[in-house]
Amino acid sequence: MERKTVLYIAVSLDGMIAKEDGSIDWLDEFEGEGDNGYSDFYQTVDTVILGRSTYEHVKVLTPVFPYQDKTCYVFTGSPDSYQDEHVTFINEGARAFTARLKQEKGSNIWIAGGAELVNDFMKEDAIDEFIITVIPVVLGSGIPLFHELTNETKLRLKGTKQFGQAVQLHYVRA
């Protein structure tokens, strides 16, 4: 089975993935069910791709890098500026990079965010599946999941799940 690139992310009802300052503390205030399907999803991937800003937030929020058991890549404009034994830093196009990854044996590839990375991948049609959990809060402002896109992407609903008051939408390319 071919590996897929999967965007797995939470958004507010108004489409924000973080507050304007990049904080995601609003997610901590949400009461769902267990881990809202995260553990089940995490078992389906063996590779995690992060943008530089998200990587830096993760390093601040967690004393131990949380993806040590996965192959982890961070997209950055200056890969030589970073060093981390758990991460490979990348500066190349999303489509070319993921095409190479898909040729390797393995499980799915998690596109973990943030917004700049997601939009770069969207512009290159490099996301195969979208698993988006909508959290019942309207932030009013913040960092939108999708912005400045010019290409239309048609999707087909694969399924939905409810976790307490949150709804998870699973789409594949149409």
Curated annotation (Swiss-Prot):
Protein localization? Membrane
- Enumerate the InterPro entries for this protein: DHFR-like_dom_sf (IPR024072), RibDG_C (IPR002734), Riboflavin_Biosynth_HTPR (IPR050765)
Q: What is its main location?
A: membrane
TM segments?
Answer: 126-146
Pfam families named among the record's database cross-references: RibD_C (PF01872)
What does UniProt give as GO cellular component? membrane
Keywords carried by this UniProt record: Membrane, Transmembrane, Transmembrane helix
Which biological process, per GO, is one annotated for this protein? riboflavin biosynthetic process
Membrane topology term reads: Single-pass membrane protein
GO molecular function per UniProt: 5-amino-6-(5-phosphoribosylamino)uracil reductase activity
Q: Which residues form a coiled coil?
A: none
Task: Please report which protein family the annotation says this sequence is part of.
Answer: To B.subtilis YyaP.
Q: What is this protein called?
A: Uncharacterized protein YwjB
Q: What is the lineage of its organism?
A: Bacteria, Bacillati, Bacillota, Bacilli, Bacillales
